[in-house]
């Protein structure tokens, strides 16, 4: 058997997401994929422990939520046994019952349901789309979000939700790009301005809504792109928002790369030739140092390290980029994650804002190469 065939088989074992990642060309990830698969499974086992405690709302300024949607998305992408175990249904039911009230919640729920079964959960995804469209700020960003009037969704009639395969549970064909999409009309807006963290997740969620068959207003993409272009710093990077006097840092810049590419894709513009994207590539290549994510408002200390690792994955996957400068992001990140997984299957940063459940979810999303690349059509 050829080396390419063996590599393709190994990637297939991680699931459809990993296999899609290596389309052109089939790049050697440079890590032991059997060890990666085992680490993913151990991480999934960890986040399924003690769910009664994990799913309780926590008091965090601006959030007021729990981690159910992030756990759900990580389990969907982990695939295999992760989506057939009873804990998966517990997390799914919990996430579906909660009223949409926050940007992160709506965005990640849309991502999870679109990856799991967009036909069965179309009504829920449509509500996520409406919530996100109605919460876009005047300047094109998103803030934490607030409740909007939404109908009570239900499962699609005549369809059954059954577990899918690894790396995304793709149990129905994605024909959203070849059939008429259901338009989402903007009915309101958020505050005057938001931040680049909520904004990058809102755009990821809206991308999933589009892929599930819902047409996001053209102006939503236009304003979203304008917000990123107008807040890019001279060094090519981004920080959290205009209010904080701090320099660019990796996680916001990686989020910016993916966000600009998403917006330009739906605006039918060539993101590959974008000066905004290429300047950001330069910043990441110059400052690539996994897992360090020095944040100015935290005194330059590395913070939100696993949030940062998942942002690397999205920047690389969305733009079909295997390296930033000389840095092969998947090899470097996967090796670091394999070295730093704890005995109980979890990951947790020792730096500020470490959290075992969140950090483990972000690690799983990185290792599974969870993000579907944007297919550039030459427009």
Regions found by a protein language model. Name each.
Residues 1-4:
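Positively charged n-region of N-terminal signal peptides that target proteins for export
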Residues 8-16:
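Bacterial N-terminal signal peptides
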Residues 17-21:
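Sec/Tat signal peptide C-region and signal peptidase I cleavage site
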Residues 22-42, 53-87, 98-130, 137-222, ...:
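An alpha-helical repeat/solenoid feature that recognizes helix-turn-helix modules
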């Amino acid at each position: 058997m050829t080396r390419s065939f063996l590599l393709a088989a190994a990637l297939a074992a991680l699931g459809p997401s990993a296999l899609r990642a290596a389309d052109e060309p089939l790049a050697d990830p440079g890590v032991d994929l059997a060890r990666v698969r085992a680490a993913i499974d151990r991480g999934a086992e960890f986040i399924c422990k003690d769910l009664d405690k994990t799913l309780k709302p926590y008091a965090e300024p601006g959030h007021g939520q729990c981690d159910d949607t992030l756990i759900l998305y990580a389990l969907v992408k982990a695939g295999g046994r992760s989506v057939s175990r009873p804990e998966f249904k517990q997390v799914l039911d919990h996430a579906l019952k909660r009223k949409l009230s926050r940007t992160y919640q709506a965005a990640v729920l849309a991502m999870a349901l679109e990856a799991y079964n967009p036909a069965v959960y179309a009504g829920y995804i449509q509500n996520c789309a409406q919530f996100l469209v109605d919460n876009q700020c005047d300047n094109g960003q998103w803030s934490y979000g607030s409740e909007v009037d939404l109908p009570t969704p239900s499962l699609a009639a005549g369809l059954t939700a059954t577990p899918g395969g690894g790396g995304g549970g793709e149990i129905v064909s994605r024909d959203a790009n070849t059939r008429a999409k259901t338009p989402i009309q903007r009915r309101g807006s958020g505050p005057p301005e938001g931040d680049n963290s909520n904004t990058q997740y809102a755009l990821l969620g809206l991308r999933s809504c589009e892929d599930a068959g819902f047409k996001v207003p053209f102006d939503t993409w236009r304003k979203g792109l304008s917000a990123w272009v107008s807040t890019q710093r001279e060094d090519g990077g981004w920080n959290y928002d205009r209010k904080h006097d701090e320099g660019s840092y990796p996680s916001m810049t990686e989020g910016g790369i993916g966000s600009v590419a998403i917006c330009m894709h739906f605006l039918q513009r060539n993101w590959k030739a974008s000066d905004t994207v290429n300047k950001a590539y330069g910043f990441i290549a110059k400052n690539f140092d996994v897992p360090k994510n020095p944040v100015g408002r935290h005194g330059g200390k590395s913070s939100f390290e696993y949030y940062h690792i998942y942002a690397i994955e999205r920047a690389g996957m969305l733009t079909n980029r295997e390296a930033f400068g000389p840095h092969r992001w998947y090899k470097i990140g996967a090796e670091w994650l394999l070295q730093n997984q704890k005995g109980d299957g979890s990951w947790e940063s020792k730096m500020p804002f470490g959290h075992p459940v969140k950090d483990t979810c972000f690690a799983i999303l990185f290792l599974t190469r969870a993000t579907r690349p944007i297919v550039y059509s030459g427009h």
